[in-house]
Amino acid sequence: MEDSLLEIMTKDGGDMPAPLEVSTVPAVGDVISGEYNGGMKELMEHLKAQLQALFEDVRAMRGALDEQASHIQVLSDDVCANQRAIVSMCQIMTTAPRQGGLGVAGGKGSFPSVPHEPETPSPGIEDSGLLGRDPDEDEDEEEKETPNPATPTSHCELSESPGLLGEDGPLVEPPDLPDITLLQLEGEASL
């Protein structure tokens, strides 16, 4: 029968039918492994890019840290220089001979190199007769100027003191006070 079919087909002038192509279906394992390999390749490339960026950041940070370290070194050198200067100044101040500079121990605030001249009275004092006075008289005048503790000093005590009345004379008048003093005294009296 098959021979008759072949003869009919060849009589019609047709060609022999081509064999059917069988499509091969990939195995499930191959699909999974391909997906896995492709995903891992992408993941590795992504991680590589991230590591490269991280290395660049680390380099930049290291450069900044080196710069900061150089600034810190400069500041440290300045601090050490200032400290040495302070120590040397303290040594100079403690070992220098004390000659009374700046008026502390040298007398009247002058430098030790300036000689002190004795104070001479001006020519007008001799004319007034102060040089020819007796020193005892000066002491008596000083005693007169200092107030006696028994004598009252304030204006209120002056007016109430019985010692202000003379034996035969009138009452001693208090000195004229400025208006401000009178106002203060009136304020104290009202209290």
Swiss-Prot record:
- The keyword Electron transport is annotated on this UniProt entry: no
Q: Which residues form the signal peptide?
A: none
Q: Where is the composition biased (Acidic residues)?
A: 135-144
Q: Which residues lie within the region annotated Disordered?
A: 101-191
The source's superkingdom equals: Eukaryota
Q: Which InterPro entries match?
A: DUF4677
Q: Which residues form a coiled coil?
A: 39-68
* Keywords in alphabetical order: Coiled coil
Q: Which Pfam families match?
A: DUF4677
A Gene Ontology CC term for this entry? cytoplasm
The record's section on PANTHER family has:
COILED-COIL DOMAIN-CONTAINING PROTEIN 184
Q: What's the protein name?
A: Coiled-coil domain-containing protein 184
Quote the gene name from the UniProt entry. Ccdc184
